[in-house]
């Protein structure tokens, strides 16, 4: 490769906006956390609708893959969305964490796509590398018996030439990626979007709330055909952001499975502990010793705190791992897989893991640092008790501002979060 080409690619890497990082006091930057694949849940979520996936008249190959994953009944959001989505309708959907939104657009896209060599037929955008990786994995799981369908994931942190070569030599039919990398590939004409028939945004409010990311999404959107299906999904979709979403759509079907004020999480026990900053480490050690858990996610507010807390836990012989932006992409994915596969039972992370990423075995979330908003709280604690299973969320409250956020959570979501009792019944948060 020539020197000029190397420089061009270096410029690309510099220009890519790493949306997943929210800089906090310079060196503290946001953290890349990684966790697990949206395992639309083995054993399946049995919702209020008893009809099976067969009622949707999906391709036999999809039904076979669904059966392999252990699903029996669609969740409420799947029951509401899939019948319309597979007909090509535009969809805007808000439903609480863990209700299988990813499977809606994955199954709908695979049902409709007619793979043509050299043409990208579906494009999925999301705001982090880890979520992109996870969504790609879901497409691979459900397209298990559709070998002619090729799926690829593109995000920053990987040399752009690898992505260009893949597009040139083995063009995928479905592309999942972050806006920065997708836009870079499309601007250089390496990625053609002229045949896209399905345009999907996952965690759409996260992308459209950010002005820079919204501009990138809009530019990508304009490169796709006018005649296409647009689907947008999120666990939190404020009334303010909904009109922005609709500007991308034509007469969309709107599905708000949960009233915004009642986004409580199915099967989740929530408590708080009042303590000083200096008492946090001792209390965390006590909790990890006393509680029964399959896997636990501990949320902190910065990369440096994630690294420090992980070091402390490892010194205390806890099986902990942390994932942050100071690592190479390869190292991050390696750790992500280790946690997902259960090799480590404790993940220390920042808010990056708080949105959209699912690991079935996680049944406890600990907010070592209070999140900065009620929305962030919802997304964080939603990592436990996924898909209607049991879970426990414990939040450390160490300041007046922490108390304010806790009050906002209780008022907005109409929940009564009580102080953690001396003894807690394991059966309330451990799946039987």
From Swiss-Prot:
SMART domains in the record, alphabetically? Answer: DEXDc (SM00487), HELICc (SM00490)
Q: Name one GO molecular function term.
A: ATP hydrolysis activity
Localization (cell): Nucleus
Please write the reaction equations for the catalytic activity of this protein.
Answer: ATP + H2O = ADP + phosphate + H(+)
List the EC numbers from the record. 3.6.4.13
| Major localisation | nucleus
| All copies of domain Helicase ATP-binding, residue ranges | 82-255
Q: Which SUPFAM superfamilies match?
A: P-loop containing nucleoside triphosphate hydrolases (SSF52540)
Keyword Hydrolase attributed: yes
Which UniProt keyword terms apply here?
ATP-binding, Coiled coil, Helicase, Hydrolase, Nucleotide-binding, Nucleus, RNA-binding
One GO CC annotation: nucleus
Ranges for domain Helicase C-terminal: 283-428
Domain of life the protein comes from: Eukaryota
GO BP annotations, alphabetical order = anther development; pollen development
Renumbered ranges of motif Q motif: 51-79
Establish whether keyword Hydrolase is in the entry. yes
Q: Where is this motif: DEAD box?
A: 202-205
User: What is annotated about its quaternary structure and interactions?
Assistant: Homodimer and heterodimer with AIP1. Interacts with API5.
By sequence similarity, the record places it as follows: Belongs to the DEAD box helicase family. DECD subfamily.
Q: Domain comment text?
A: The Q motif is unique to and characteristic of the DEAD box family of RNA helicases and controls ATP binding and hydrolysis.
What does it do?
A: ATP-binding RNA helicase involved in pre-mRNA splicing. Required for the export of mRNA out of the nucleus. Required for tapetal programmed cell death (PCD) and degeneration during anther development. Forms dimer with AIP1 and binds the promoter region of the cysteine protease CP1. Can complement the yeast RNA helicase SUB2. Plants silencing AIP1 and AIP2 are male sterile.
Stated name of the protein: DEAD-box ATP-dependent RNA helicase 15
Native organism: Oryza sativa subsp. japonica
The beginning of the lineage is: Eukaryota, Viridiplantae, Streptophyta, Embryophyta, Tracheophyta
Q: Which gene encodes it?
A: AIP2
């Amino acid at each position: 490769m020539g020197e000029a080409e190397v420089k061009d690619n270096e410029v690309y890497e510099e220009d890519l906006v790493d949306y997943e990082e929210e800089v906090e006091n310079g060196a503290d930057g946001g953290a890349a956390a990684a966790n697990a694949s949206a395992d639309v849940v083995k054993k399946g979520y049995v919702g209020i609708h008893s009809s099976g996936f067969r009622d949707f008249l999906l391709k036999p190959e999809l039904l076979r893959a669904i059966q392999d994953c252990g699903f029996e009944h669609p969740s409420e959001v799947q029951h509401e969305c899939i019948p319309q989505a597979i007909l090509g309708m535009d969809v805007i959907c808000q439903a609480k964490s863990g209700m299988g939104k990813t499977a809606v657009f994955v199954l709908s896209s695979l049902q409709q796509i007619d793979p043509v060599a050299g043409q990208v037929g579906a494009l999925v955008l999301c705001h982090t590398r880890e979520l992109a990786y996870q969504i790609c994995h879901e497409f691979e799981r459900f397209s298990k018996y559709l070998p002619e369908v090729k799926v690829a994931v593109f995000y920053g942190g990987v040399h752009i030439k690898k992505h260009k070569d893949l597009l040139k030599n083995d063009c995928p039919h479905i592309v999942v990626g972050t806006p920065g990398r997708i836009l870079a590939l499309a601007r250089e004409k390496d990625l053609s979007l002229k045949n896209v028939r399905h345009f999907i945004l996952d965690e759409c409010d996260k992308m459209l709330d950010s002005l820079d990311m919204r501009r990138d999404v809009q530019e990508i959107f304009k490169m796709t055909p006018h005649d296409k299906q647009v689907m947008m999904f999120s666990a939190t979709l404020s009334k303010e952001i909904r009109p922005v979403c609709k500007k991308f759509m034509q007469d969309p079907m709107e599905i708000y499975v949960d009233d915004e004020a009642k986004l409580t999480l199915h099967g989740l026990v929530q408590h708080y502990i009042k303590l000083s900053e200096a008492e946090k480490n001792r209390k965390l050690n006590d909790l990890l010793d006393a509680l029964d858990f399959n896997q636990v996610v501990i949320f902190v507010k910065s990369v440096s705190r994630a690294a420090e807390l992980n070091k402390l836990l490892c010194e205390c012989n806890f099986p902990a791992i942390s994932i942050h932006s100071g690592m190479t992409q390869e190292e991050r994915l390696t750790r992500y897989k280790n946690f997902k596969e259960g090799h480590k039972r404790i993940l220390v992370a920042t808010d990056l893991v708080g949105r959209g990423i699912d690991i079935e075995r996680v049944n406890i979330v600990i907010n070592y640092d209070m999140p900065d908003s009620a929305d962030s709280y919802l997304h964080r604690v939603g990592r436990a008790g996924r898909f209607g299973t049991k879970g426990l969320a414990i939040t450390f409250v160490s300041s007046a501002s922490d108390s304010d956020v806790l009050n906002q959570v209780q008022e907005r979501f109409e929940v009564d979060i009580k102080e953690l009792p001396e003894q807690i019944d394991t059966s309330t948060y451990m799946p039987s």
